[in-house]
A protein has these predicted regions:
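Short, low-complexity, intrinsically disordered N-terminal peptides in bacterial proteins
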Residues: 1-9, 315-326
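C-terminal membrane module of polytopic membrane proteins
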Residues: 259-323
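Cytosolic, membrane-interface loops and tails of multi-pass inner-membrane proteins
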Residues: 19-45, 234-267, 317-324
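Extended hydrophobic-aromatic, low-complexity segments
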Residues: 215-219, 236, 248-249, 267, ...
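Short alpha-helical linear motifs
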Residues: 98, 121-124, 169, 246-248, ...
Length: 326
């Protein structure tokens, strides 16, 4: 029952705070203006992840009031990452500073879990996941829907294996994601910004580390991220092969090509990513490895090949409008 209240608190605070965050960002001039590498066509305020940060605080208040086990150090680290993201939204921090901050906060996560080998592991996990979520937050609804899948998986794993901190992180992620979704899809009135993608990245990293340290199986927590990992890795490999800067913004992700080339709507592409992630997750939660491995591999291959497959099948024609404006 407590999880339900935490879920409602994070959802209610996020959806209520979103218009306030939008007004604040507009006053601050924190607006994304479309350019040649954007997937949106309308200037839109970013930094809406502040509402999710407040939603997380709402869940924490409920948890503390009910004497729940709260992984305070990991949550604090996630909040610290979101503040780095907020600063980047406002002032455009250098890539070197952002990377150093991510590694430092990740290492701190490892220290709080006992140190030793967990320090480099946590530093890597936090940095990788934060950047992965940030890179993939490029069309309407993709982060909210995908993080809802991950949060649900985290809660289920936490319940099945009695990792209570993971239960809290899971429901908070679901509540914040669903609370933000109406403001970001089908057409966006507000973007998460780095403050939001860094927050979700930090919470996902925290969940992975909680599962690892708590003896829970990791694959059900990793499975919701397979599409993110595959898409990000494929985009980076393409840029390495061409000798292009890795950290420069681009429109080479699969989901971006589905929208810009095939004219699939933002929400349809985002839903497709979330559904595929959910299918992979379900197989790792309730099926044997002999089923989970090939199903996950097939999902990854089909997703990466989807622009070519859909184009060849002529299911989408060039006359289809190029997605909904962001």
């Amino acid at each position: 029952m407590t999880s339900v209240v935490e879920l409602f608190a994070s959802f209610a605070v996020t959806i209520t705070a979103a218009p306030l965050a939008r007004s604040w960002m507009l006053r601050q001039g924190c607006v994304d203006v479309p350019n040649y590498r954007s997937s949106h066509t309308v200037p839109t305020p970013r930094g809406g992840g502040v509402a999710c940060l407040l939603g997380l605080c709402g869940a924490l208040v409920v948890a503390a009031t009910n004497a729940r086990d709260v992984p305070w150090a990991l949550v604090a680290a996630s909040i610290a990452l979101s503040l780095v993201g907020y600063a980047d939204d406002q002032t455009d921090l250098s890539s070197g500073f952002r990377l150093a901050a991510q590694v430092l906060v990740g290492a701190t996560m490892g220290v709080t879990l006992g140190g030793g080998w967990l320090i480099p592991v946590a530093a890597f996990v936090a940095t990788a996941v934060v950047n992965m979520v940030n890179f993939m937050d490029g069309i309407n609804g993709i982060t909210s829907l995908s993080m809802t899948v991950w949060g649900a998986a985290a809660w289920i794993v936490g319940v099945l294996h009695d990792v209570r901190g993971l239960q809290l992180v899971g429901v908070a992620v679901v509540g914040c994601s669903l609370g933000f979704l109406p403001w970001n899809a089908p057409s966006a009135r507000l973007f998460l910004g780095d403050v939001g993608s860094y927050l979700f990245g930090g919470l996902v990293a925290s969940g992975l580390l909680l599962g690892l340290s708590g003896g829970a199986p990791l694959m059900p927590l990793v499975a919701p991220l397979v599409i993110y990992a595959a898409d990000t890795s494929a985009a980076l490999v393409r840029r390495v092969v061409r000798g292009e800067p890795l950290l420069h913004a681009h429109r080479e992700h699969v989901y971006q090509r589905l929208v810009s080339t095939l004219g699939i709507t933002h929400l349809a592409a985002s839903t497709g990513v979330a559904v595929l992630s959910a299918v992979a997750t379900v197989t790792w939660l309730w099926c044997d490895t002999v089923i989970s491995v090939p199903v996950t591999a097939l999902i990854v291959v089909l997703y990466l090949a989807s622009p070519r497959l859909l184009s060849a099948s002529h299911l989408w024609s060039v006359d289809v409008p190029k997605g909904l404006p962001r």
